[in-house]
Amino acid sequence: MTDNLTRAFKELLNQERFGSQSEIVDALKKQGFTGINQSKISRMLSKFGAVRTRNTKMEMVYCLPNELSVPNTSSPLKNLVLDVDHNAMLIVIKTTPGAAQLIARLLDSIGKSEGILGTIAGDDTIFVTPTNDKPIDELLQNIQRLFENTL
């Protein structure tokens, strides 16, 4: 992938007006790039962590959030977790987009011995259910301590 293609691709996504991969293909072809197809665009979207979101006109479009990057196992947890809150029944963890499943897998691996009965993860939100034998405040503190560590 050339630097020019990467730059043009990112510039197009920053315009927040492309709702389909075929629209991105067409726009890049109009700029003179050859060999561009939907499959290549799909790989580029994944590589750069693009997400579909609503723009200011409430249209679903692809974009590259500047402040976000695709999380991986070497990312410090404190950089991926945005907020941890709870009520009497659940702990809710808000993460950067794409990080919830990675963090939920880590929490599940800690397991019942540390007071975690299970997790449910979406793209950027995790529900943590505590076991009956661990006070939720204690589990919350353990989870917050875990997020302060860098793995």
From Swiss-Prot:
Subcellular location: Cytoplasm
Family per similarity comment: Belongs to the ArgR family.
Protein's name according to its UniProt entry: Arginine repressor
Gene Ontology cellular-component annotations: cytoplasm
Organism of provenance: Haemophilus influenzae (strain PittGG)
Cysteines paired by S-S bonds: none
Gene3D superfamilies on file: 3.30.1360.40, Winged helix-like DNA-binding domain superfamily/Winged helix DNA-binding domain (1.10.10.10)
NCBIfam families: argR_whole (TIGR01529), PRK05066.1 (NF003457)
A molecular-function term among this protein's GO annotations: DNA-binding transcription factor activity
A Pfam short name: Arg_repressor
Predominant subcellular localization, coarse grouping: cytoplasm
InterPro entries: Arg_repress, Arg_repress_C, Arg_repress_C_sf, Arg_repress_DNA-bd, WH-like_DNA-bd_sf, WH_DNA-bd_sf
Function as written in the Swiss-Prot or TrEMBL entry: Regulates arginine biosynthesis genes.
Pathway connected to this protein: Amino-acid biosynthesis; L-arginine biosynthesis [regulation]
GO biological process, one term: protein complex oligomerization
Keywords per UniProt: Amino-acid biosynthesis, Arginine biosynthesis, Cytoplasm, DNA-binding, Repressor, Transcription, Transcription regulation
